[in-house]
């Protein structure tokens, strides 16, 4: 595993302090990963050590005590962390999505997510309460009820799913639909753990990515006062800075985790074939079929890494991609996940039967990588977006 290079991707036009996950910390995180997986436990010690190392502040401006990293550099950190512990990278990455969303909003002249940056600067852990059962519209509609309190605040009632960091968050984003006015509005706000009326079910027992503890969440009329309501948007797709900031950071930081998983699978395969010797005494690494397979895997990961890096840099540099933004973001995420799953599966085939042991790291990666298909945007959703971008909407 190598440290992330964070010399690029810092806040444009501002000072930045390069930040890396130190090798000794990476090693401890990697050592704990099998135990968290086996026990289906939250990565609490990883969070404690990363918080102490400044990880929760890497995207916070230097003036507020952070490192000022942009999306490109944060993606590199996530890729490195995922090589040590995919579930830790995925779960804690939800915090980084909010930090980078706030950065994108700020870079585009808005300040409504300043409280997100302020809380991250105080080392508070941010989580997402967005996904809902059966809601394929994700940010563009909600089955959660947002009831106005008459003073600018709201009470939220509904069910959220895949709430990563459930045991540990300090601040949870919520959104729901207010249907009391002439037109329905989607209301976004933030809940503090001390607010109460938020219930997490102990129902996270999954094939992989177990240390995220992404539990089902019940909102029992939780009250969010006016000063923690950040946006009210129309139902349906829109280009609001909140939507863009969250969408860009989510898709690319998710993609980065799965690129890191693929990188680790290649490293494990290379190590395994380097130690194996055929019956005739020749090293397995000299087998032309093995060499061709690993060459193909290396090329596939190089290609998707370049795509993620280029698009993250475009976000940092505020490139004007217009209507191309969303097709590029969903396509890159979908390709990253598909590539990672292919790479892990092929790495297992190249390594052979030892990879099939439940104790093998590759076997754990094979389970973890399959979570990628369940994060928005799915392959089918991405395909619909891409088709619409070239053919227009269906009749």
Description of each model-found segment:
Residues 3, 7-11, 15:
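Asp/Glu-rich intrinsically disordered low-complexity tracts
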Residues 260, 295-302, 330, 334-341, ...:
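Generic structural signal for well-ordered, non-transmembrane alpha-helical segments
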Residues 30, 34-37, 302-335, 348-356:
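C-terminal helix-coil-helix/basic helical segment that borders enzyme active sites and/or dimer interfaces
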Residues 44-51, 58-159, 164:
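Glycine-rich flavin
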Residues 353-395:
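Glycine-rich phosphate/cofactor-binding loops in nucleotide/flavin-utilizing enzymes
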Residues 159-200:
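A short core secondary-structure module
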Residues 206-301:
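Glycine-rich beta->alpha junctions and the first turn(s) of the following alpha-helix
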Residues 161-166, 250-253, 372-375:
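Glycine-rich phosphate/pyrophosphate-binding beta-alpha loops
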């Amino acid at each position: 595993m190598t440290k992330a290079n964070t010399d690029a991707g810092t806040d444009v036009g501002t000072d930045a302090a390069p930040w890396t996950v130190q090798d000794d910390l990476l090693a401890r995180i990697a050592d704990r990963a099998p135990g968290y997986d086996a026990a289906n436990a939250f990565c609490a010690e990883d969070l404690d050590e990363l918080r102490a190392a400044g990880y929760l502040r890497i995207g916070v401006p230097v003036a507020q005590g952070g490192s000022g990293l942009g999306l490109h550099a944060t993606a590199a950190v996530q890729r490195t962390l995922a090589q040590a512990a995919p579930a830790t990278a995925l779960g804690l990455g939800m915090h980084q999505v909010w930090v980078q969303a706030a950065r994108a909003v700020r870079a585009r002249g808005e300040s409504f997510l300043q409280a997100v940056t302020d809380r991250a600067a105080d080392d508070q852990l941010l989580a997402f309460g967005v996904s809902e059962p059966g809601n394929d519209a994700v940010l563009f509609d909600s089955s959660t009820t947002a009831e106005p309190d008459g003073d600018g605040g709201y009470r939220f009632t509904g069910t959220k799913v895949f709430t990563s960091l459930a045991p540990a968050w300090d601040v949870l984003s919520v959104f729901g639909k207010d249907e009391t006015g002439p037109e329905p509005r989607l209301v976004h706000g933030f809940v503090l753990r001390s607010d109460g009326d938020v219930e997490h079910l102990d129902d996270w027992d999954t094939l992989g990515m177990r240390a995220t503890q992404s539990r089902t969440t019940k909102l029992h009329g939780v009250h969010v006062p006016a000063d923690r309501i950040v946006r009210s948007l129309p139902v349906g797709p829109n280009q609001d800075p909140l939507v863009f900031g969250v969408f860009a950071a989510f898709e690319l930081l998710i993609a980065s985790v799965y690129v890191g998983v693929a990188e680790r699978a290649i490293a494990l395969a290379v190590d395994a074939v380097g130690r194996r010797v055929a019956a005739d005494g020749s090293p397995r690494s000299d087998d032309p079929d093995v060499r061709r397979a690993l060459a193909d895997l290396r090329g596939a990961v190089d290609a998707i890494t370049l795509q993620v890096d280029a698009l993250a840099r475009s976000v940092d540099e505020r490139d004007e991609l217009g209507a191309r933004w969303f097709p590029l973001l969903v396509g890159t995420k979908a390709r990253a996940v598909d590539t990672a799953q292919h790479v892990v599966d092929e790495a297992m085939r190249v390594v052979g039967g030892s990879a099939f042991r439940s104790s093998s790291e590759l076997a754990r990666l094979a389970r973890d990588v399959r979570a990628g298909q369940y994060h928005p945007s799915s392959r089918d959703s991405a395909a619909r977006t891409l088709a619409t971008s070239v053919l227009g909407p269906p009749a």
